[in-house]
Amino acid sequence: MSKTIKVILLTSSEKVIGEIVEVGSEIGEPDCKLIKPYEVQNLAPWMEDHTDQNEFMISSDKIITMADPKSDLLKNYLEKIN
């Protein structure tokens, strides 16, 4: 199964890159899983100052938009996580 790596703009104005998976959930519960999200600006793990987790549940209503990353950003991200 191929991973879906996207650049994600959150309602908080944060831009992250990572794998995103849609998951089934009850109404009002988080319905997306972000796997190994990194801040786009400095390619550092998202929320690294606050947690050691690398998977996060997030509600889709916190996502403004998603896009395919530029090839150089994707390459740099994949080098960081592997």
Whereabouts are the PLM-identified features?
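Conserved RNA-binding domains used in RNP assembly and mRNA/RNA metabolism
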Residues: 2-82
